[in-house]
Amino acid sequence: REGKPLDVTITVHNGRMAAFYRQRRYLVSRVSLNGHIDTRGVSDLHIKTGEFGGTMVGNGIEADCEIDFKEKSLPSIVSVTAKGVIPSSMGLGDDIHDKMTLTASGRGPLSHLICEGTVTMPELHVPALDFYDVKGDIHYDDGAMTFSDVKARVYGGIVTARGDYNVDSRVYNIYLHGEGLDSRIPTKEPRFYCLVTLDGEIHCDGNVKDLVAFGSFSSSGGFYSLIPFRGITGTFHNRYRALDFYDVTIDTDFGLIHTDAFHIIDGKLHLGKIELVDKESGEAMSITDARNQKGPGRVISQIREDIKERVS
């Protein structure tokens, strides 16, 4: 209208819409829109959509927006809910299709909205980790998102997380702390039980193939087969579908069981060389060699007898 003011009521049923801003693009189907546009006053719009794609892929968006055209900066008040968002479409992980819901509301100039909201997911499955009932807080400021107080159930325990994510570069960093994780679930080994505490980090430079996770862990007392232990310590590294553990030490009554590496690949446990280390002398011997001869401190047969005595 060549700069002329608008004062109209608008209604759209089952439409299609394309939106572009900076490096972001969105293609939206089944659009229903109604509201009032007044370029000399306050405009309000309500929009509800079906599936959308582009920079982010999901099942639907519902939004309310109020824009004040009386001021040059176009101060706005918005509330948005995006349902069924696929994490992989945002660069969050490789081939992750568990769906999340993002809800946010905020205000500010239309070109620089600052919003607060929540993220929720019924479940999230990533290589070697299964999260349930994910819920946390988000803060959005000009393409930068921060996550805080995110909680989820993982392997019978609780994991809390915080992090940051950039919509345009898709660079993100996530910091995790977990407590009470049941070792039997990820290893799929009922004979190996303890409750694990872990601290970890996940980093991505924008290319999901470069995603890396690492951290350290410790555990309460537990048992492997019939052998009890006081606790486990070690570090881990996760890339793609392989979860690697390094410098793992198991503290037992008869010595320290140590391995430089064992791996969980596609859900299967692969053990490396395991050594039995005497706490006093530091002498090490492989478990295989210790089976039929004196190992560090004791022979394996004596260990078994000790276990039987404790049980009886």
Write out the residue ranges for each language-model feature.
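Short acidic-hydrophobic surface loop/beta-edge motif
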Residues: 52-54, 150-152, 250
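Membrane-proximal interfacial segments on either side of biological membranes
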Residues: 1-48, 59-246, 255-312
